[in-house]
Amino acid sequence: MRSSLAPGIWLLRAFSRDSWYRGLILLLTFLIYTCYHMSRKPISIVKSQLHQNCSELERPDNNSNSTTWCYWAPFDQDNYSQLLGGVDDAFLIAYAVGMFISGIFGERLPLRYYLFAGMLLSGIFTSLFGLGYYWNIHQLWYYVLVQIFNGLAQTTGWPSVVTCIGNWFGKGKRGFIMGIWNSHTSVGNILGSLIAGIWVDSAWGLSFIVPGVVIAVMGLISFFFLVEYPEDVNCTPPQHHSWCLESSDEGVLWHYLHCPFIFLQGVMEFSLCLLFAKLVSYTFLFWLPLYIVNVAHFGSKEAGDLSTLFDVGGIIGGILAGIISDYTNGRATTCCVMLIVAAPLLFLYNSVGQNGISSSIVMLIICGALVNGPYALITTAVSADLGTHKSLRGNAKALSTVTAIIDGTGSIGAALGPLLAGLISPTGWNNVFYMLISSDVLACLFLSRLVYKEIQVLELEGLLGHSILGAPPNPTFCVNHSLPLGAAGEPETNL
């Protein structure tokens, strides 16, 4: 008598060959960018160790300096906040500048080779920062130079993984899929914090070396297993533009095809919004553990562990933003609402968040969700929507450039945030939070035009009783042959 089909084989047969490959790509790109973010996080955990309160520690008998013996030069000066901010900005400015160039290379080079080289270099430069501990290096230029090269190497990651995802997944439920997928940012931050926290008090060099080795190994795995296009393994390519009207007016398409990507409708607004949203997110990324140490008076490891709750909230916020934007067809509106709600809650966290461990946990999770939700949505679903725009005529490689433009502009904010925090924090942490609140409000204002258009479309759909042609999440992205060109060369609409 034959036995029934083995459960494992039944599971394998339950999904198509295309589904298994898509699952592999989703998992692999998730792990790839998790490693990128994991390798960025240790500096925020180690900051409190580079300049700590020596009076709370037991001083060695052979050390006569009772006030600065535990500092790590060159961060033993009174302007240590500015020096640490400068180290952050060396990475972030290089990242912002390199991001605009990275998209161009990403279009022309095989993503598998490009990612492998970038991850290997990122691992080397991350480890070199930690080796400064073992080599007893106390020159500021060394750490700044390592951060610059690391920032340039890290620009290989984001355009590549978003392009790969865009090649494999269509627009259906893109916000939900990418909301889950984009949790790699927060998962990487959490892992980076926990790994760095293991050695921060004993040998902080390992806080950098271990993540550096991990990202290099992951680069090797991506070299062997990453598939850039579904066609490379005889899988069915996704349908990106089934929702869009087929245009008979070649003039409209020709106009868009020959315009710089920055003038594609929505790119400018979302880029500027991301600039301020990322300013807030990266200020928390690089300065939250030190804020907790200074205000709540936790140890370095405890502050690092507590700061991971902000990223836990980021995972929740990214998924919620994706689900809501898919359901409402309103990417811009979803982002704007979350940003506006985040502003007063940031003020509340600074005011009462450190009164007790319970209030701190709750506020960190909520603030993390509201701050990182819009950031996650813009850098994933919105970038993919714009990069697979109908006017690009299926040019999937353009997705790398569009993604680089949006994330590169956002990275300018990522560089400004930690720099401003380093300059402002000596005047009081309250002023830092006022800066963050103002940035959230400005981010929302840049989306106001798109929000207005989305609301008009929703009202029109309500009058008609159905969705307008299965409209995309932002209907202004779609080229409609019935819309004449305006004075600026853009399709006019009376919506």
Predicted regions and their residues:
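Cytosolic juxtamembrane N-terminal segment immediately preceding the first transmembrane helix
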Residues: 1-38, 43-44, 52, 56-75
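Hydrophobic core of transmembrane alpha-helices in multi-pass small-molecule transporters
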Residues: 125, 139-156, 357-388
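Short amphipathic helix-loop junctions that connect adjacent transmembrane helices
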Residues: 45-81, 286-302, 384-388
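C-terminal ends and interior cores of transmembrane alpha-helices
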Residues: 120-137, 340-354
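Helix-loop-helix hairpin linking two adjacent transmembrane segments in secondary transporters
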Residues: 181-233
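Cytoplasmic membrane-interface "Motif A"-like loop-to-helix N-cap segments
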Residues: 107-119, 326-340
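Cytoplasmic helix-loop-helix junction between adjacent transmembrane helices
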Residues: 144-187
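Extracytoplasmic gate region of multi-pass secondary transporters
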Residues: 43-45, 264-315, 319, 375-380, ...
